[in-house]
Amino acid sequence: MIIDWKAHILPGLDRKCDSHVKAIQLMIYAKRAGVDKLVAMPFYEAGTDLRQFIEMRDEAFASVRGLVGEDMPELMLGTEFKYDKQILDTDGVELLKETPVLLVDFGGKLPSDEELKALRDYFGDRLMVSDADTLSDEDKLRLTGLGFQSVVDLSEIRHSKDIKKLLPFVESGFVRGFGGDKLAGRDPYRHLEKTKRRMGEGFEKLCKKLC
């Protein structure tokens, strides 16, 4: 099974998806590329009304889910946010906690272990790291030791050596999957198709280890 953990398919919330027509196109492209499941991943901006964001997010997700046909990938709901010390004190954070999948962006710099533990304890296994590719191996080991998992951007997987570099973190359980956040263009899943063709069996083995 191939899962895109960072799908931008919610009109009104995702800049890369400005209409329901675009959402349908992206789902079709994803299925054509062999993606079995999409996790809709809008971004929550710290300091904005979290309750209002969640209400808009849920409405957008319901409208897109209503368009899903048998020939499209399965959908899940998620939310990504940039780490902020105040996130656990934000009004409505208990609603965010109910989201099936959460991604946190640390901005390339990890907070203290105490803050990381508080974040992990509150959100649990549903929370993963979205910017692990910007972190040092030492930071990745810190996060692994604290029970975090991560999603790697698909654009980071271009050659067999990239898979070889990832494998230790896949084996340790730190890397759980990938998404296409940095992929631009009309069809962000074209890179996935090219990667599958270029790497063949190596990419298939990686997907099996991730899933």
Model-derived segments and their meaning:
Residues 4, 14-18, 105, 176, ...:
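Acidic side chains
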Residues 135-211:
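Charged catalytic cores and adjacent phosphate/nucleic-acid-binding surfaces used
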Residues 8-10, 43, 78-84, 107-109, ...:
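Active-site beta-loop-alpha junctions enriched in small/polar residues
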Residues 19-20, 112, 159:
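A conditional alpha-helix N-cap/helix-loop micro-motif detector
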Residues 4, 40, 78, 103, ...:
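Generic enzyme active-site microenvironment
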Residues 24-31, 120, 124, 144, ...:
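A structural alpha-helix within SAM-dependent methyltransferase catalytic domains
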Residues 50-150:
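Extended substrate/RNA-proximal surfaces in nucleic-acid metabolism proteins
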Residues 1-72, 141:
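An N-terminally biased module of ancient metal coordination in phosphate/nucleic-acid-related enzymes
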